[in-house]
């Protein structure tokens, strides 16, 4: 019975244990299934110039509206697309949206993608790559560290047709092979995984508008199931064409103004937008364990489908309610636990009420009136970013949690009356609401909705990051707080940008801990080729180092081979060396203590006492002190290097330095090394001191030996370099040698020692050293040891007492040692000493690095040396001087991508005339970080100084001198006042706030007269208009911009640019102004508006066959000012020919004008009635009288204002009278006409402007200003609702505008004259399309663009593809298509290189390889192809590798293997291979005649020998009897029917040479 009870008890125990185990497993499974997921990194690109999550927060917290007009750089027919009629086929009634105006920008080089492949890539792929990299960096993770990991990649997107409508472009052979991977949607995720080298799940999700939130849901599920441990989740949308606008216009789904008015009564549709957002997520438990900063937590998510509901694209309320409840269940939360919902909120009349009712039915039923559910919509700020909408909403809510504020929802006139708001407690965020942390210990929570037009719905529940556990205080770094801030980049330009970003970060983040930031920079940033390090012990010191080029350690990491430690001999010592490190470096102090113990057996003094210079301690003047101390310092510094991760692959010692090298190599124990250095130095002190000397000469060894022939007491002691030789011996002869060298101009330096190492004098201590060093126990080195005594590697235990005598007696071969090591692949030589003495003798082909320096023996110098090593490519372990990672890493700037524009050009057919049409457009700029100014600035003001503006300049760091320049101040008076200001330091910049042309001209002239060369900025208000929604430009102020464009050409050295402010600049606008003045944008024509910074661009204005908006024909009376001049008469003829009944031609001379009579007859013959009137068009009374006299039966219907006065003088000699004359007829006349005809119904009001006002023209400053006035006047009339068209003409053929000397000038520079008939056809088109402005010019961009920018680079022309291409063309490099074949079969390019001297061939061949590689990849310059960078990193794939092989095969005249590029993986390696194969000099010829024959034969193909009739003779010389009929007999004829000499003709030149000059057959 008892036995059964025991069995039952055991059974119950077992079952209970199993139940407990199963319960625990179920609990674990349940926990994993619902485990929260941490968001640890975020990145985005959104409308309004948003380039980061912080930018997004600034936008929404500031109630920013990011909606803008259509982009003008994508080939869209911006004007032709618009039609207010929603039924107009192929048109849209909406012409605004949320755009990424830099969507075409991409740093292809950074990602190792060739320009050609980048051009073929959907911009969505490029944005996804960029933001993915930034999201990882923002998490404090080095993206390259993820290679080989199971990172998941989940990206939402949809096909937007980047290549649609680009037929001609995509058929380009250059893009073949790239279009599939470039356009296919699956590559959105696949390319990210490929670039990062990850092998986890990679999925592209297309559920339309809900794509990115579905992607996040899938990422969460994958993490919970263990399919990956970390994941990227996000979405992207770019609209390369306007198809979406057209399609949704037919459905009447768009907001007319492009703005989503979410949940508002005024809602009228959604505003399409673009964007990209990426999150880096991992399981919460992993994030905590890995020490990653947690931004927020995904508590739960759900996805469902509408199914067969009210329509395929219609939203379905019940499905939305279900997905919300499922997400809450997944989060294990109740509706009342959520504070706010970031709604889908598109602003449609159908969708918003359905969504609101679903929210009210779920959340709204469990919220109180005191704590209602808040409802917001990011789309009201940026529009509907489609596949990126969900992730954008998540980023907004994460930022709201972090900042404790719920932003306002814009454009709500009142909450929608289509929603029953009383049915639940949901409150629309019509104003911002504080969102503080909860006092009851609860957590803030938000939910985000995203509903796809496809019917797929997603809902995600977010929670604020859990409270961070108190971490132990950050340990102060060893060494007194001196830390490195390393930064690196792929290119020098990117490095400079990185440095600038980090400097701005240090300046703006006063709370940053330098050591924590250093740890983050080391751990979370990829170490790239171009490197810099700031070293300092405080934020201020590091900031200052970043701001000053001389404060940084810089270098490159290319061609890193093996590392050798170099230990010098005497001469590195200085009093106090190493003392600071005893206190700041534990590793150094510990090693010195070991040395102290070892040395103490042989010396009666204390190592530490000597180093610290304690009273009574011996000095370094004694050889028996200095050598042991130097040894101890060197081996201790070696320990420090090794502690920081630098392990030598070899050691080299110079003289006594070989003792330290032997110890570090393991060839001597520390005790034996101490014995050698102490006892040998004692012997030197006892027997050699005072009897010798040493001298260093700047000569090679041979030259020194020649000089020593006259000195029997001297010998070469050491050969340190090609021109660095040391001599030792008799001190008297040393002095005599020094005198003779000085007399001969040879640099000589007597070394401060009184004994002669490496000379015959040493022989007297040979016996003593043999005795005292007997019993040494040398070992085989475990670190390779190269002996400068033997000139070879030491591999056996041979460093006995005899060796150390010989080391002291014989010559030191340091230079040959370095040469040998360099051949063996050693590239970096670290001189381990208290002061570098050998580094400067190293050849330029290797990198020499020091350790300490004289009087710089502390931690700062040590860290700087470590920084120099890292900057030059070595891997440094910074951990010993940095705090341990805590997970609280600072938000450092992410990589400063250096982008270029990649965008397929539209293939829409264009007429030849379209090539003449241009417009001005404004490109939104992405605002850079906080800028600052420095130095003295002069600010010219009118009567009332701009206090706020001046305050902004001062707050940015500028020292401001204000100078008032009134209308009555002439140039002389201004120059005198400027001269009086020029005392003390010079000026950094000049700002003109003048708003009138006359004082502005005087100001520019006075600056030159006063000799002030500081760059001048002209700051205006309302001088330009950046688009349809902007206020029209003020014509008078527009003249300042016309003038400025000419100053830029006439005085490029002292011109900075033009900046236009809004009428009422706020703090943000003034901050943008500072950014512009700092030069950070790189732009020189900038407009600042509430939407940000805009840069002026010239762009093509093709009509693309667009239908005219009206059928314009002249009729009635047409008034032509300047009507008897060349341009006016052309216009008159055209008007008469096309139906004008009455032509009223106005000029100053009237009928007395030359040719007036003939013109009248010609026009009359065309059927028009002609009136020629003498009248000053600038006289309003005279013009009023003239207009009143126009017959009622032919009313005035059109005006053509061609009148103007020539103005071709440089600005420096332009006086007030010239200004009045030029402006009189042109601008005053136009203003009079505008004023007198206001309200008169006209069909056309044409202003003849000029290209001078568009891009400037030298010596036409006032003329350009006048034309800018006309362009602005036309826009002002349009804004008033009256017709106006300004045409900025180029050069006309025949008599007319711009003739004479200027004609030839502009033709030479690429402005070709236009035929008047064709020019007038362009005028007719502009009128038929009712255009406000168009520039018409025939430009040869290959000539004009370089000429226009030769003295001053300008981005103005960047919007014209031909100009951009002309400016990007490499200059002075071999042409990539050079296939001209030289007589040898080589290309002419290689033949030219062959003709160069041998030392110049290698670099020339490398340039040729880089040039061809650049051409294959699509780069504009070989500079973009780094010599040492792998072809795979440069963007080569199998296709482009074969293309490069083909080009180089043509160059060398021989077919190269298909694997050539991959067999020689860098341009430098490939160039070296080609040099050896095709350019290496032949083996030295045994005789001169043989060399001449070889060269002659190498240059002559066999056909030439045969044709010359000498082939038989050459063959006979080789011992071969030619066959009959070979065609090579002297004077003989070939047999036409004979077989060709295949065996001979197939020989290459080298084979023929071997045949001719090889052994003779006997």
UniProtKB/Swiss-Prot annotation:
<dbReference type="InterPro" id="IPR001227">
    <property type="entry name" value="Ac_transferase_dom_sf"/>
</dbReference>
<keyword id="KW-0045">Antibiotic biosynthesis</keyword>
<dbReference type="GO" id="GO:0004315">
    <property type="term" value="F:3-oxoacyl-[acyl-carrier-protein] synthase activity"/>
</dbReference>
<dbReference type="InterPro" id="IPR016039">
    <property type="entry name" value="Thiolase-like"/>
</dbReference>
<dbReference type="Pfam" id="PF00698">
    <property type="entry name" value="Acyl_transf_1"/>
</dbReference>
<dbReference type="InterPro" id="IPR018201">
    <property type="entry name" value="Ketoacyl_synth_AS"/>
</dbReference>
<dbReference type="InterPro" id="IPR016036">
    <property type="entry name" value="Malonyl_transacylase_ACP-bd"/>
</dbReference>
<dbReference type="InterPro" id="IPR014043">
    <property type="entry name" value="Acyl_transferase_dom"/>
</dbReference>
<feature type="active site" description="For beta-ketoacyl synthase activity">
    <location>
        <position position="384"/>
    </location>
</feature>
<dbReference type="GO" id="GO:0016747">
    <property type="term" value="F:acyltransferase activity, transferring groups other than amino-acyl groups"/>
</dbReference>
<feature type="active site" description="For beta-ketoacyl synthase activity">
    <location>
        <position position="344"/>
    </location>
</feature>
<feature type="region of interest" description="Module 5">
    <location>
        <begin position="37"/>
        <end position="1475"/>
    </location>
</feature>
<dbReference type="GO" id="GO:0033068">
    <property type="term" value="P:macrolide biosynthetic process"/>
</dbReference>
<dbReference type="Pfam" id="PF16197">
    <property type="entry name" value="KAsynt_C_assoc"/>
</dbReference>
<feature type="region of interest" description="Beta-ketoacyl reductase">
    <location>
        <begin position="1116"/>
        <end position="1293"/>
    </location>
</feature>
<dbReference type="InterPro" id="IPR015083">
    <property type="entry name" value="NorB/c/GfsB-D-like_docking"/>
</dbReference>
<feature type="domain" description="Carrier">
    <location>
        <begin position="1403"/>
        <end position="1478"/>
    </location>
</feature>
<feature type="modified residue" description="O-(pantetheine 4'-phosphoryl)serine">
    <location>
        <position position="1438"/>
    </location>
</feature>
<protein>
    <recommendedName>
        <fullName>Pikromycin polyketide synthase component PikAIII</fullName>
        <ecNumber>2.3.1.239</ecNumber>
        <ecNumber>2.3.1.240</ecNumber>
    </recommendedName>
</protein>
<dbReference type="Pfam" id="PF00550">
    <property type="entry name" value="PP-binding"/>
</dbReference>
<feature type="active site" description="Acyl-ester intermediate; for acyltransferase activity">
    <location>
        <position position="655"/>
    </location>
</feature>
<keyword id="KW-0596">Phosphopantetheine</keyword>
<feature type="binding site">
    <location>
        <position position="1226"/>
    </location>
    <ligand>
        <name>NADP(+)</name>
    </ligand>
</feature>
<dbReference type="GO" id="GO:0004312">
    <property type="term" value="F:fatty acid synthase activity"/>
</dbReference>
<dbReference type="GO" id="GO:0042802">
    <property type="term" value="F:identical protein binding"/>
</dbReference>
<dbReference type="Pfam" id="PF08659">
    <property type="entry name" value="KR"/>
</dbReference>
<dbReference type="InterPro" id="IPR036736">
    <property type="entry name" value="ACP-like_sf"/>
</dbReference>
<feature type="region of interest" description="Acyltransferase">
    <location>
        <begin position="565"/>
        <end position="866"/>
    </location>
</feature>
<feature type="binding site">
    <location>
        <begin position="1147"/>
        <end position="1150"/>
    </location>
    <ligand>
        <name>NADP(+)</name>
    </ligand>
</feature>
<feature type="binding site">
    <location>
        <begin position="1176"/>
        <end position="1177"/>
    </location>
    <ligand>
        <name>NADP(+)</name>
    </ligand>
</feature>
<feature type="domain" description="Ketosynthase family 3 (KS3)">
    <location>
        <begin position="34"/>
        <end position="464"/>
    </location>
</feature>
<dbReference type="InterPro" id="IPR016035">
    <property type="entry name" value="Acyl_Trfase/lysoPLipase"/>
</dbReference>
<keyword id="KW-0808">Transferase</keyword>
<dbReference type="GO" id="GO:0006633">
    <property type="term" value="P:fatty acid biosynthetic process"/>
</dbReference>
<dbReference type="InterPro" id="IPR009081">
    <property type="entry name" value="PP-bd_ACP"/>
</dbReference>
<keyword id="KW-0012">Acyltransferase</keyword>
<feature type="compositionally biased region" description="Low complexity">
    <location>
        <begin position="1532"/>
        <end position="1541"/>
    </location>
</feature>
<dbReference type="InterPro" id="IPR006162">
    <property type="entry name" value="Ppantetheine_attach_site"/>
</dbReference>
<dbReference type="InterPro" id="IPR036291">
    <property type="entry name" value="NAD(P)-bd_dom_sf"/>
</dbReference>
<dbReference type="InterPro" id="IPR050091">
    <property type="entry name" value="PKS_NRPS_Biosynth_Enz"/>
</dbReference>
<dbReference type="InterPro" id="IPR020841">
    <property type="entry name" value="PKS_Beta-ketoAc_synthase_dom"/>
</dbReference>
<keyword id="KW-0511">Multifunctional enzyme</keyword>
């Amino acid at each position: 019975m008892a036995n059964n009870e025991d069995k039952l008890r055991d059974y119950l125990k077992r079952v209970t244990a199993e139940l407990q185990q199963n319960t625990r497993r179920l609990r674990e499974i349940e926990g994993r299934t619902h485990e929260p997921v941490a968001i640890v990194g975020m990145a985005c690109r959104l409308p309004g110039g948003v380039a980061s999550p912080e930018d997004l927060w600034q936008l929404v917290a500031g109630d920013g509206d990011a909606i803008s007009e259509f982009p003008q750089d994508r080939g869209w027919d911006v004007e032709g697309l618009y039609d207010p009629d929603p039924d107009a086929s192929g048109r849209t009634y909406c012409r605004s949206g949320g755009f990424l105006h830099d969507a075409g920008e991409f740093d292809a080089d950074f990602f190792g993608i060739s320009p050609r492949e980048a051009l073929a890539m959907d911009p969505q792929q490029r944005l996804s790559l960029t933001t993915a990299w930034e999201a990882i960096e923002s998490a404090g993770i080095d993206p390259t560290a993820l290679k080989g990991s199971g990172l998941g990649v989940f990206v939402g997107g949809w096909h937007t047709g980047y290549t649609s409508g680009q037929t001609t472009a995509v058929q380009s052979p250059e893009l073949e092979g790239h279009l599939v991977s470039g356009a296919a949607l699956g590559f959105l995720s696949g390319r990210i995984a490929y670039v990062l080298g990850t092998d986890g799940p990679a999925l592209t999700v297309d559920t339309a508008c809900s794509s990115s939130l579905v992607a996040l849901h899938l990422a969460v599920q994958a993490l919970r199931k263990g399919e990956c441990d970390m994941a990227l989740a996000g979405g992207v949308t770019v609209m390369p064409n306007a198809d979406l606008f057209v399609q949704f216009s037919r459905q009447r789904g768009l907001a007319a103004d492009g703005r989503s008015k979410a949940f508002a009564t005024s809602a009228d549709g959604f505003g399409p937008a673009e964007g990209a957002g990426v999150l880096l997520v991992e399981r919460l438990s992993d994030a905590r364990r890995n020490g990653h900063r947690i931004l927020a937590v995904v508590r739960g998510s759900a996805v469902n489908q509408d199914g067969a509901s009210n329509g395929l694209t219609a939203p379905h309320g019940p499905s939305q309610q279900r997905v919300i409840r499922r997400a809450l269940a997944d989060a294990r939360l109740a509706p009342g636990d959520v504070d706010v919902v970031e709604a889908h909120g598109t602003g449609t009349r159908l969708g918003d009420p359905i969504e609101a009712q679903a929210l009210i039915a779920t959340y709204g039923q469990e919220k109180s009136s005191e704590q209602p559910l808040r409802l917001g919509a990011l789309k009201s700020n940026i529009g509907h970013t489609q596949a990126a909408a969900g992730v954008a909403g998540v980023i907004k809510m994460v930022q709201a949690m972090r900042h404790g504020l719920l932003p306002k929802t814009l454009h709500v006139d009142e909450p929608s009356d289509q929603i029953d708001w009383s049915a639940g407690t949901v409150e629309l965020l019509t104003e911002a609401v504080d969102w503080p942390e909860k006092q009851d210990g609860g957590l803030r929570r938000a939910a985000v909705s995203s509903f796809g037009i496809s019917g797929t719905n997603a809902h995600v529940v977010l929670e604020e990051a859990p409270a961070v556990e108190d971490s132990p205080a950050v340990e102060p770094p060893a060494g007194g707080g001196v830390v490195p801030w390393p930064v690196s980049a792929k290119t020098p330009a990117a490095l400079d940008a990185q440095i600038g970003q980090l400097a701005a970060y240090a300046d703006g983040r006063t709370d940053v801990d330098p050591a924590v930031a250093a740890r983050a920079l080391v751990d979370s940033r990829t170490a790239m080729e171009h490197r810099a390090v700031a070293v300092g012990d405080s934020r201020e010191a590091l900031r200052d180092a970043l701001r000053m080029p001389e404060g940084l350690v810089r270098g490159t990491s290319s061609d890193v081979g093996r590392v050798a430690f170099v230990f010098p001999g005497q001469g590195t010592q200085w009093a106090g060396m190493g003392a600071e490190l005893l206190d700041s470096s534990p590793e150094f102090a510990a090693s010195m203590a070991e040395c102290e113990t070892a040395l103490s057996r042989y010396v009666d003094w204390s190592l530490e006492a000597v180093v610290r210079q304690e009273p009574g301690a011996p000095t370094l003047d004694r050889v028996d002190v200095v050598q042991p101390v130097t040894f101890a310092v060197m081996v201790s510094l070696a320990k420090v290097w090794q502690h920081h991760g630098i392990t030598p692959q070899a050691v080299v010692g110079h003289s006594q330095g070989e003792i330290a090298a032997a110890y570090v190599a393991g060839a001597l124990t520390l005790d034996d090394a101490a014995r050698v250095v102490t006892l040998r130095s004692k012997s030197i002190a006892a027997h050699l001191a005072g009897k010798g000397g040493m001298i260093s000469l700047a000569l090679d060894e041979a030259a020194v030996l020649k000089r020593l022939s006259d000195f029997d007491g001297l010998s070469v002691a050491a050969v340190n370099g090609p021109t660095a030789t040391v001599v030792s011996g008799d001190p008297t002869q040393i002095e005599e040698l020094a005198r003779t060298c000085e007399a001969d101009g040879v640099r000589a330096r007597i070394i401060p020692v009184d004994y002669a190492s490496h000379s015959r004098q040493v022989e007297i201590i040979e016996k003593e050293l043999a005795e005292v060093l007997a019993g040494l126990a040398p070992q085989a080195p475990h670190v390779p040891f190269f002996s400068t005594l033997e000139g070879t590697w030491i591999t056996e235990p041979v460093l006995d007492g005899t060796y150390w005598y010989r080391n002291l007696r014989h010559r030191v071969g340091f230079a040959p040692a370095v040469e040998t090591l360099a051949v063996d692949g050693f590239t970096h030589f670290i001189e381990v000493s208290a002061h570098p003495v050998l580094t400067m003798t190293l050849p330029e082909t290797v990198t020499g690095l020091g350790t300490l320096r004289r009087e710089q023996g502390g931690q700062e110098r040590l860290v700087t040396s470590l920084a120099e090593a890292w900057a030059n490519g070595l891997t440094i372990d910074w951990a010993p001087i940095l705090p341990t990672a805590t997970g609280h890493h600072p938000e450092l700037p992410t990589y400063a991508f250096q982008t270029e524009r990649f965008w397929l050009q539209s293939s829409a057919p264009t007429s030849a005339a379209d090539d003449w049409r241009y417009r001005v457009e404004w490109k939104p700029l992405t605002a850079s970080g906080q800028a600052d100014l420095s130095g003295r600035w002069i600010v010219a003001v009118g009567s009332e100084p701009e206090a706020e503006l001046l305050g902004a300049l001062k707050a940015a760091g500028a020292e401001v001198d204000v100078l008032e320049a009134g209308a009555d101040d002439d140039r002389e008076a201004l120059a005198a006042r400027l001269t009086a200001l020029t005392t003390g330091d010079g000026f950094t910049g000049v700002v003109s706030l003048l708003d009138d042309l006359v004082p502005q001209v005087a100001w520019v002239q006075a600056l030159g007269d006063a000799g002030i060369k500081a760059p001048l900025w002209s700051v205006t208000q309302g001088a330009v208009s950046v688009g349809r929604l902007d206020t029209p430009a003020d014509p008078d102020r527009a003249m300042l911009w016309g003038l400025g464009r000419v100053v830029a050409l006439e005085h490029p050295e002292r011109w900075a640019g033009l900046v236009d402010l809004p009428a009422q600049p706020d703090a943000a606008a003034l901050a943008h102004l500072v950014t512009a003045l700092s030069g950070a944008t790189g732009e020189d024509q900038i407009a600042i508006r509430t939407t940000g910074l805009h840069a002026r661009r010239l762009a093509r204005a093709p009509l693309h066959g667009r239908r005219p908006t009206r059928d314009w024909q002249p009729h009635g009376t047409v008034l032509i000012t300047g009507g008897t001049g060349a341009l006016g008469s052309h216009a008159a003829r055209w008007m008469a020919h096309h139906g004008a009944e009455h032509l009223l031609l106005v000029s100053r001379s009237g009928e007395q004008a030359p040719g007036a009579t003939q013109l009248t007859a010609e026009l009359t013959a065309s059927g028009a009635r002609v009136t020629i009137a003498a009248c000053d068009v600038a006289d309003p009374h005279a013009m009023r009288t003239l207009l009143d006299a126009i017959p009622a039966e032919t009313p005035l219907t059109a005006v053509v204002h061609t009148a103007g006065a020539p103005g071709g003088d440089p600005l420096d000699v332009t006086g007030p009278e010239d200004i009045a004359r030029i402006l009189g007829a042109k601008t005053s006349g136009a203003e009079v006409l505008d004023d007198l005809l206001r309200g008169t119904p006209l069909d056309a009001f044409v202003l003849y402007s000029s290209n001078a006002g568009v891009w400037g023209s030298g010596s036409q400053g006032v003329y350009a200003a006048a034309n800018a006035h006309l362009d602005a006047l036309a826009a002002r009339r349009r804004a008033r609702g009256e017709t106006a068209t300004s045409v900025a003409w180029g050069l006309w053929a025949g008599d007319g505008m711009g003739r004479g000397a200027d004609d030839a000038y502009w033709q030479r520079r690429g402005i070709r004259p236009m035929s008047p008939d064709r020019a007038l056809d362009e005028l007719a088109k502009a009128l038929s399309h009712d255009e406000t402005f168009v520039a018409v010019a025939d430009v040869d961009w290959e000539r004009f663009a370089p000429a226009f920018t030769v003295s001053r680079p300008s981005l103005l022309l960047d919007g014209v593809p031909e100009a951009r291409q002309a400016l990007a063309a490499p200059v002075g490099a071999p042409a990539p298509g050079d296939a001209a074949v030289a007589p040898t079969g080589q290309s002419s390019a290689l033949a030219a290189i062959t003709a160069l001297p041998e030392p110049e061939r290698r670099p020339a061949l490398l340039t040729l390889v880089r040039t061809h590689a650049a051409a294959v990849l699509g780069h504009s310059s070989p500079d973009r192809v780094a010599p040492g960078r792998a072809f795979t990193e440069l963007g080569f794939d199998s296709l482009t590798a074969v293309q490069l092989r083909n080009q180089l095969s043509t160059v060398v005249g021989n077919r190269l293997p298909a694997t050539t590029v991959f067999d020689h993986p860098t341009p430098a390696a490939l160039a070296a291979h080609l040099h050896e194969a095709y350019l290496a000099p032949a083996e030295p010829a045994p005789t001169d005649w043989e060399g001449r024959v070889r060269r002659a034969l190498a240059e002559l193909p066999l056909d030439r020998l045969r044709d010359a009739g000498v082939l038989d003779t050459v063959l006979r010389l080789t011992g071969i009897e030619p066959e009959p009929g070979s065609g090579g007999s002297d004077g003989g004829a070939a047999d036409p029917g004979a077989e060709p000499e295949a065996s001979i003709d197939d020989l290459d030149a080298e084979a023929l040479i071997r045949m001719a000059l090889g052994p003779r057959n006997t």
